[in-house]
């Protein structure tokens, strides 16, 4: 019996680990830690929490994902995809609500892994993924306009449309120096890769703009550039572990947000791991990765952190700088911890406009406009799912977008599946490719009073409706209906219900149903549903020639 393997990749790595591997991982871990720093701060603030919570998340989640994960090079931490969800949860349920929702999401992720749902999650329709990712990107960009241009607004509306109306009404309050810092930050981040692939543009922008803001304040008396320290009390103290008080009412109210965090985290982490596999030629264990992500999201909020997942940008940075084992991810977490302990107080000098610039670039990278445009050329059903998910994300929230998007995608999928199932009527002789030998061809003439139908494809509710319509189109009432099912791979509960109704209606009309060529799988499903109690075992035939013989016997008696 095959065992359920949830062994972390780290254990296999250590068997053949050597000094050369360590030196590569050390360099990659240091660079990824430096890259993760400004992103963790920016994601924390944009999510509505303090900057240190973003870094704490990167440390705790980054360490645990690398320690327990199913990917050798995955880097975990806070990501832009969670900004919208976290901000919405805090607004509605407060920080404690976010903590409980994140813990619940961690439990869900662990269950996903234990139930081996890792491969299934990968099947979430691509238009939904692109739709909500693009919607999140637009939302992140929208939330940064105030800080990017230094607008004077007491309270920014939460509604997307109202937010933009507010920005337009207050754009005259834009601060020149904040705008310069924000725009220059975007430019620096965008052009840095042209000069160096190793140095993260976001770090360069933060260093340059922080120094510039300090010089402008010191020597030019310009104090209008708001910094992190103006908005938050920055601390480098490691928070104590705090377990929130959970009530049944709170848990019930947070199921939907927690499930959204879990599903989004699962999608993003497995997508990141899959992309990384393609680059280094490896294969991750999806279920182990989900368990690791779950543990990370259980632990992170206990230290005051926020939801975390696998981060594609940091994972690719890890690969590009030589990281090939989980040790690189662990080193990245240690580097972040050292920076947090010794340099965190300096973060208070970072301009808010600069962080807004960092997030503008993040939102551009997330939007995936090329994929969006490409999908717009796909079938209308895909375009419908894409646009509905996209607009629901920016107008309402991600929870609604994913739920509605999945429902619509499922309905459209079922419609497509029903269209692939073909029901045809055989009028005179059965002489096409057959499941019997040519020697028995004389037995294949259809007797008077007998109708033969052949179903090709899965038999479920869509096919059942099609079948009923075809039968209703015949004016004459036969004595026997043979349903040939040799090409039916499976039948669902709706299909069984449809067949049951068909048998009962036919019996009332004096018509006998005979099944032919039922596969072992479908036979087992029908038997389990006690369908044969209605039909009768004598009306189940393994081949069409036997079904025709049975039909002749029934007709002769009537």
Regions found by a protein language model. Name each.
Residues 28, 186, 190, 465, ...:
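Short, contiguous clusters of charged residues that form electrostatic/catalytic patches at enzyme active sites
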Residues 534-550:
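Short acidic-hydrophobic, aromatic-tinged amphipathic segments that line or gate anion-handling sites
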Residues 365-534, 552-558:
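The feature marks cytosolic C-terminal regulatory regions of anion transporters and related permeases
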Residues 76, 131, 515-516, 541:
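Active-site-adjacent beta-strand anchor residues
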Residues 1-427, 432, 530:
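Transmembrane helical cores of multi-pass ion-transport proteins
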Residues 86, 164, 467-471, 547, ...:
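Generic hydrophobic alpha-helical segments
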């Amino acid at each position: 019996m095959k065992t359920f393997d949830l062994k972390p990749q780290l254990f296999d790595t250590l068997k053949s680990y050597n000094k050369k591997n360590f030196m590569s991982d050390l360099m990659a871990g240091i660079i990824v830690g430096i890259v993760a720093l400004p992103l963790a701060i920016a994601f924390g603030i944009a999510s509505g929490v303090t900057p240190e919570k973003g870094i704490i998340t990167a440390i705790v989640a980054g360490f645990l994902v690398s320690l327990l994960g199913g990917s050798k090079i995955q880097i975990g931490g806070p990501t832009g995809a969670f900004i919208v969800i976290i901000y919405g949860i805090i607004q509605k349920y407060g920080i404690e609500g976010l903590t409980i929702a994140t813990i619940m999401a961690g439990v869900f992720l662990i269950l996903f892994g234990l139930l081996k749902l890792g491969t299934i999650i990968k099947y979430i329709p691509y238009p939904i993924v692109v739709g909500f990712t693009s919607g999140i990107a637009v939302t992140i960009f929208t939330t940064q306009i105030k800080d990017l241009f230094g607008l004077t607004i007491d309270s920014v509306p939460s509604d997307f449309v109202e937010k933009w109306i507010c920005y337009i009404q207050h754009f005259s309050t834009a601060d020149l120096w904040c705008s310069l810092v924000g725009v220059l930050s975007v430019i620096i981040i965008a052009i840095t890769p042209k000069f160096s692939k190793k140095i993260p543009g976001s770090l360069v922008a933060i260093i340059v703009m922080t120094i510039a803001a300090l010089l402008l304040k010191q020597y030019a008396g310009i104090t209008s550039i708001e910094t992190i320290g103006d908005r938050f009390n920055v601390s480098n103290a490691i928070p104590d572990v705090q377990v929130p008080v959970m009530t049944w009412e709170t848990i019930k109210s947070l199921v939907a947000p927690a499930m959204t965090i879990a599903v989004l985290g699962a999608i993003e982490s497995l997508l990141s791991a899959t992309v990384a596999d393609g680059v280094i030629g490896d294969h991750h264990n999806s279920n182990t990765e989900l368990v690791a992500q779950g543990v990370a999201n259980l632990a992170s909020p206990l230290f005051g952190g926020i939801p975390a997942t696998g981060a594609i940008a940091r994972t690719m940075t890890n690969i590009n700088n030589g990281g090939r084992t989980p040790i690189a991810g662990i080193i990245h977490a240690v580097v972040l911890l050292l920076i947090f302990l010794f340099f965190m107080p300096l973060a208070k000098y970072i301009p808010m406009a600069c962080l807004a610039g960092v997030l503008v670039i993040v939102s551009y990278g997330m939007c995936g406009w090329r994929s969006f445009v490409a999908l717009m050329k796909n079938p209308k059903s895909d375009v419908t799912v894409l646009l509905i998910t996209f607009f629901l994300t920016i107008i309402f929230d991600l929870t609604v977008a994913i739920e509605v998007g999945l429902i619509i995608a499922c309905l459209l999928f079922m419609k497509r599946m029903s269209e692939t199932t073909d029901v045809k009527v055989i009028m005179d002789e059965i002489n096409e490719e057959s499941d019997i030998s040519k020697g028995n061809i004389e037995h294949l003439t259809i007797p008077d009073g007998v109708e033969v139908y052949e179903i090709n494809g899965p038999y479920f509710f869509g096919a059942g409706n099609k079948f009923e319509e075809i039968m209703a189109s015949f004016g004459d009432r036969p004595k026997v209906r043979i349903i040939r099912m040799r090409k039916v791979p499976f039948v669902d509960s709706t299909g069984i219900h449809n067949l049951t109704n068909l048998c009962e209606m036919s019996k009332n009309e004096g018509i006998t149903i005979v099944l032919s060529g039922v596969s072992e799988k479908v036979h087992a499903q029908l038997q389990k549903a006690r369908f044969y109690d209605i039909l009768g075992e004598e009306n189940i035939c393994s081949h069409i020639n036997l079904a025709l013989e049975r039909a002749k016997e029934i007709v002769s008696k009537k």
